Design a protein with these regions (language model features):
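A short amphipathic beta-strand at an alpha->beta junction
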Residues: 23-46
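Phosphate-binding P-loop
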Residues: 51-56
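Gly/Ala-rich phosphate-binding loop of Rossmann-like dinucleotide-binding domains
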Residues: 23, 78, 82, 183
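Conserved catalytic-core segment of NTP-binding enzymes
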Residues: 165-166, 172-226
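Walker A/P-loop phosphate-binding motif and the immediately C-terminal alpha-helix
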Residues: 57-94, 209, 222
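A short interface-forming secondary-structure element
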Residues: 1-22, 34
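Phosphate-binding/switch loop-helix module in NTP-utilizing enzymes
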Residues: 135-182, 202
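Phosphate-binding loop that captures ATP/GTP phosphates
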Residues: 81-143, 149, 153
Length: 226
């Protein structure tokens, strides 16, 4: 985990929370989080965020390809953090294949608040928002890039998230326009790459790591699912 020296204390605390949460997941034998200081572009020097959420830390869970357990990991990470007493939200940014509603056991449509923002549905004490709440399960999302980005912006800025300790973003698989825009337009504290042991999956995972490095988002770690 590469961090800036200025915020080392903050990331040491975050690393401890990650380790404690990951240790509780079934099938995890051991977890080691190593911190390395490096000089990076400061938040103030980045372009101003288009996506505004009042969260202490925003963590993106990404993968180079689909079918590697990215969404499963994102949901389990959110639940583990919630069980540690943190205020957690999960945003399903996988517009074309939303799976968080089913994994969290939620159905129904979000209601609107008096200020015309959507109220996220809750499960296991976690606030959840997904395009899957707004379209039928059997309806394909046949949208071009601009419509996808508009929907993502709505799920950030048009939702009553409240104050969160952590927002977990389940990104779409790959390294396309949606992933790049989310990385550049939201104040990500870090990212986690999920992969499987196969060479093809690991090659795609490297692309994801390189994408986050280019936009100066720390890669917290790589999770290898079996």
């Amino acid at each position: 985990m590469y961090v800036t020296e200025k915020h080392l204390d903050k990331y040491e605390k975050l690393a401890g929370i990650f380790k404690e949460g990951l240790d509780k997941l079934d099938g995890v034998l051991s977890v080691n989080v190593a911190l390395t200081s490096e000089n990076q572009v400061s938040r103030a020097e980045k372009s101003e965020s288009r996506f505004q959420i009042d969260a202490t830390d925003i963590i993106a869970v990404a993968s180079g390809k689909g079918g590697v357990g990215k969404s499963t990991f994102a949901v389990n990470l959110a639940v583990a953090m919630s069980q540690l007493g943190k205020k957690v939200g999960i945003l399903d940014a996988d517009i074309y294949g939303p799976s968080v509603p089913r994994m969290m056991g939620i159905s129904g449509r979000p209601e609107a608040s008096p200020n015309k923002k959507l109220i996220p549905l809750e499960s296991y004490g976690i606030k959840c928002m997904s395009i899957g709440f707004l379209v039928s399960v059997d309806t394909p999302t046949i949208w071009r890039g601009p419509m996808v980005m508009k929907a993502l912006e709505q799920m950030f800025n048009g939702v009553e998230w409240g104050k969160l300790d952590y927002l977990i973003i389940d990104l779409p698989p790959g390294t396309g326009d949606a992933q790049l825009t989310l990385a550049q337009s939201s104040k990500l504290s870090g990212s986690i790459i999920v992969s499987t042991p196969q060479d093809v999956a690991l090659n795609d995972a490297r692309k994801g790591i390189n994408m986050f490095k280019r936009v100066n988002v720390p890669v917290i770690g790589l999770v290898e699912n079996m």
